[in-house]
């Protein structure tokens, strides 16, 4: 009887332990189920409200942008400042080149150069402009004008030589004077001259007065004591030598009336000119 009682107590203790373990496992399972269910509900709630998530993302982006914006502005300001310095340096070099050229062409004491600079802000692409003004005094201008006039001043000697080179036979006339017209017609009507006679009208020449004065003073075989006013055109040159030195009557008209003008012209031709008498038909 006593043995049966001890066995019964032992069996009852085992059942109690089994129940406790089973209950513990059940509670643990329920707790795990509730935990998994809560996580799924939280993820569904977050996915069901995208506007709020988007708003939060935008706020975070704005915070990051505000944080980085000062650094970007500082970098842009530094870049534009460097570009301003480069532009200003280029303009300064160009102005130096212009001033050096002005100093070469114009005497320094007679010129004044002022430079004005105006710059725009970096918002308008950092445009830097330069204005250079050069002022010349009247004395400098007159000297420059006189220099140009002297450079283009008429040289009668050079002009005379250029005309003589056009032909071995050259006749200088004045179309308003009878002696000039008479000699021109005489040579063209009665004489064959080759190369062709070159005729220069001093009244139509742009510097006829200076050219005639040079001929009278330097190219005629006359007495140096003779007055230049008494010498009149025409002036005939064969091979650069003057034929008329004592006047039209003594050097042209008298020899022509005696039949001596052709030999006179041939003697001055010296083989460089062909001078022949033309066959003039008689009136009979």
UniProtKB/Swiss-Prot annotation:
Gene Ontology cellular component annotations, sorted alphabetically: fungal-type vacuole; membrane
Keywords noted in UniProt: Membrane, Transmembrane, Transmembrane helix
Protein's recorded name: Pheromone-regulated membrane protein 4
Transmembrane segments: 20-38
Main location: membrane
Membrane association type: Single-pass membrane protein
Record-linked PROSITE patterns: GLUTAREDOXIN_2
Domain Glutaredoxin: 157-272
Protein's UniProt keywords contain Membrane: yes
Localization in the cell: Membrane
The keyword Methyltransferase is annotated on this UniProt entry: no
């Amino acid at each position: 009887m006593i043995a049966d009682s001890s066995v019964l107590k032992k069996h009852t203790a085992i059942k109690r332990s089994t129940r406790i373990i089973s209950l513990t496992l059940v509670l643990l399972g329920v707790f795990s189920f509730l935990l998994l269910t809560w996580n799924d509900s939280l993820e569904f709630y977050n996915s069901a409200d995208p506007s709020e998530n988007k708003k939060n993302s935008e706020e975070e982006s704005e915070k990051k942008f505000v944080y980085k914006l000062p650094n970007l502005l500082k970098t842009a300001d530094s870049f534009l400042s460097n570009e301003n310095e480069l532009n200003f340096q280029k303009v300064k070099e160009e102005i130096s080149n212009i001033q050096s050229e002005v100093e070469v062409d114009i005497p320094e004491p007679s010129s004044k150069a002022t430079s004005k600079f105006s710059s725009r802000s970096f918002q308008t692409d950092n445009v830097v402009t330069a204005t250079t003004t050069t002022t010349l005094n009247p004395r400098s201008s007159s000297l420059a004008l006189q220099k140009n006039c002297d450079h283009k001043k008429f040289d009668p000697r050079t002009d005379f030589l250029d005309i003589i080179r056009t032909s071995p036979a050259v006749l200088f006339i004045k179309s308003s004077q009878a002696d000039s017209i008479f000699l021109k017609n005489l040579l063209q009507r009665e004489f064959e001259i080759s190369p062709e006679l070159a005729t220069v009208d001093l009244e139509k020449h742009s510097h006829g007065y200076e050219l005639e004065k040079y001929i009278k003073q330097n190219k005629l075989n006359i007495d140096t004591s003779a007055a230049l006013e008494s010498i009149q055109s025409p002036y005939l040159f064969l091979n650069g030598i003057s034929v008329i030195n004592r006047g039209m009557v003594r050097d042209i008209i008298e020899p022509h009336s005696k039949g001596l003008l052709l030999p006179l012209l041939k003697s001055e031709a010296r083989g460089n000119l062909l001078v022949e008498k033309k066959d003039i038909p008689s009136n009979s």
